[in-house]
A protein has these predicted regions:
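Acidic, contiguous N-terminal accessory segments
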Residues: 1-9
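Short amphipathic alpha-helical segments, especially helix-boundary/capping motifs
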Residues: 1, 39, 80-81
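A short, well-structured beta->alpha microelement
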Residues: 7, 14-68
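Output/docking surface of receiver
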Residues: 57, 74-117
Length: 117
């Protein structure tokens, strides 16, 4: 009997075309390291468990708060060139760099997410 592990869907809010290309390439090139995840680049993060949020884009935090209010099990990750010094959400600063992205708190987020299941 084989078990297929459910991939964790990663969505996005307001990411730039450059961010989307970078992240899609990371998921494609780092399939082994990111095998627990599936990235959905659409602007509809309703099904996502983890949401990458463009902190530099006006209005995305309001969208995130509405989304998180409807489903508090979702985990957000702020991406931006200027990030708050203190944030309840994990942060990833621009410019996005492969090593930083893979070694970011995403693994910790997955652990936290799986512990809550």
């Amino acid at each position: 009997m084989s078990f297929v592990s459910e991939k964790i869907l990663v969505g996005q809010l307001g990411l730039t075309a450059r961010d989307l290309t970078f992240i899609k390439n990371i998921f494609r090139l780092s399939a082994q390291q990111l095998s627990k995840f599936r990235f959905d680049e659409s602007e509809d993060p309703n099904q996502a468990r983890i949401v990458l949020i463009n902190n530099d884009e006006p209005g995305t935090m309001a969208k995130w708060h509405g989304l998180h209010h409807r489903d508090s099990s979702k985990q957000g990750v702020l991406i931006g060139s200027s990030l708050p010094l203190r944030s309840a959400l994990p942060t990833l600063s621009r410019p996005l760099i492969l090593k930083r992205f893979i070694q970011s708190r995403i693994e910790q987020i997955v652990s936290d997410f799986q512990a809550r299941r």
